From Swiss-Prot:
Protein EC: 3.6.4.-
InterPro entries according to UniProt: AAA+_ATPase (IPR003593), AAA_lid_4 (IPR041445), DNA_helicase_Holl-junc_RuvB (IPR004605), P-loop_NTPase (IPR027417), RuvB-like_N (IPR008824), RuvB_C (IPR008823), WH-like_DNA-bd_sf (IPR036388), WH_DNA-bd_sf (IPR036390)
Region (Large ATPase domain (RuvB-L)): 1-182
Recorded catalytic activity of this chain's protein: ATP + H2O = ADP + phosphate + H(+)
Similarity annotation: Belongs to the RuvB family.
Binding site for DNA: R292, R311, R316
Main location: cytoplasm
Domain of life: Bacteria
GO molecular function, one term: four-way junction DNA binding
Function: The RuvA-RuvB-RuvC complex processes Holliday junction (HJ) DNA during genetic recombination and DNA repair, while the RuvA-RuvB complex plays an important role in the rescue of blocked DNA replication forks via replication fork reversal (RFR). RuvA specifically binds to HJ cruciform DNA, conferring on it an open structure. The RuvB hexamer acts as an ATP-dependent pump, pulling dsDNA into and through the RuvAB complex. RuvB forms 2 homohexamers on either side of HJ DNA bound by 1 or 2 RuvA tetramers; 4 subunits per hexamer contact DNA at a time.
Record note on quaternary structure: Homohexamer. Forms an RuvA(8)-RuvB(12)-Holliday junction (HJ) complex. HJ DNA is sandwiched between 2 RuvA tetramers; dsDNA enters through RuvA and exits via RuvB. An RuvB hexamer assembles on each DNA strand where it exits the tetramer. Each RuvB hexamer is contacted by two RuvA subunits (via domain III) on 2 adjacent RuvB subunits; this complex drives branch migration. In the full resolvosome a probable DNA-RuvA(4)-RuvB(12)-RuvC(2) complex forms which resolves the HJ.
Organism: Erythrobacter litoralis (strain HTCC2594)
Protein name stated in the entry: Holliday junction branch migration complex subunit RuvB
Region named Head domain (RuvB-H): 256-343
Length: 343
């Protein structure tokens, strides 16, 4: 049986009231400075020429603002915004219905674009390149090909698994944008802004404490902020301070690095059962009773970013920092130092 959805997961959850906290413009958007500066140029250039902006691909870990940036692009271009996701577009007719209902220069956002049906993807190619749909009408000897012209539009794709995109699809995006984990300083700004929108009093130390445990991810920061607010309100605390945030997050089993019970189970399994590794991801997924995708997309990226774990050709290994976080010594003969640049 799998555990309930952990508080730290960067995946969007149905109950997340993210909409009210989302920035409405590039000026309000915190972090991703290089991507933001480049997007501002592309938006202004498209607007000044009266053209649709080039097709754009956002890739990177979940929860970093891909959907929000897509909405901001549409808003700053002054055009319509349609959103869907790869798994929802089951057949070519679904895609045709979306594309033929677009107004000139509209933005079509496809989340999880790496999960598009291959048949649908083939139909998308001429739509992106030639602004046309090539559809087969009828069956058997009576079947005929029909080309439907489309208005100029901007396709924005988002993926957490860029490597799963086919080369023909990836190459059709003129603007590839990688989104990276946020710094603590950037997340502190996200928390402070979110608290202000909630009408929650928070001091700098309290915001910093939440930011420090947010896994470099704004979506996680927003979720932790809402849970800290719950504790603060019940305790009748006028202002969220560092001790209040620390006490709330400790009760939620989110440690000083932002790791929770799932992360610690992952690290402990590698340490205790496999003596620090290497161990394959399929073995870890089976031992944790979690899908492989959850391990690779949710658990591992931040642990690797922190230098706690190394992903090698032979499997996953604990680094020295991983052993230190578990407050243990690596066993004699372990391969720990090989992946830290230490002997």
């Amino acid at each position: 049986m799998t555990d309930p959805i952990p508080l730290h997961t960067p995946d969007r959850q149905p109950e997340d009231p993210d909409v009210a906290l989302r920035p409405k413009s590039l000026a309000e958007f915190v972090g991703q400075a290089a991507a933001k500066d480049n997007l501002a140029v592309f938006i202004e250039a498209a607007r000044s020429r009266g053209e649709a902006m080039d097709h754009t691909l956002f890739f990177g870990p979940p929860g970093l603002g891909k959907t929000t940036l897509a909405q901001i692009i549409a808003r700053e271009l002054g055009v319509g915004f349609r959103a869907t996701s790869g798994p929802v577009i089951a057949k070519a007719g679904d895609l045709a219905a979306l594309l033929t209902n677009l107004e000139p220069h509209d933005v079509l956002f496809i989340d999880e674009i790496h999960r598009l049906n291959p048949v649908v993807e083939e139909v998308l190619y001429p739509a992106m390149e030639d602004r046309a749909l090539d559809l087969i009408i009828g069956e058997g000897p009576a079947a005929r090909s029909v080309r439907i012209d489309l208005p100029p539009f901007t396709l924005i794709g988002a993926t957490t698994r860029q490597g799963l995109l086919t080369t023909p699809l990836r190459d059709r995006f003129g603007i590839p944008v990688r989104l990276n984990f946020y710094t603590e300083e950037e997340l502190e700004k996200v928390v402070t802004r979110g608290a202000g929108l909630m009408g929650l009093a928070i001091d700098a130390a309290g915001a910093r404490e939440i930011a420090r445990r947010s896994r470099g991810t704004p979506r996680v920061a927003g979720r932790l902020l809402r849970r800290v607010r719950d504790f603060a309100e019940v305790q009748k605390a006028g202002t969220v301070t560092s001790p209040i945030a620390d006490a709330a997050l400790t009760r939620l089993e989110v440690d000083g690095l932002g790791l929770d019970a799932m992360d610690r189970r992952y690290l402990t399994m590698i340490a205790d059962i496999y003596k620090g590794g290497p161990v394959g991801v399929e073995t870890l997924a089976a031992g944790l009773a979690e899908p492989r995708d959850t391990i690779e997309d949710v658990v591992e990226p931040y642990l690797i970013q922190l230098g706690l774990v190394a992903r090698t050709a032979r499997g996953r290994c604990l680094n020295d920092r991983g052993w230190e976080h578990l407050e243990r010594q690596p066993p004699a003969g372990s391969q720990t130092g090989l992946f830290d640049g230490k002997s």
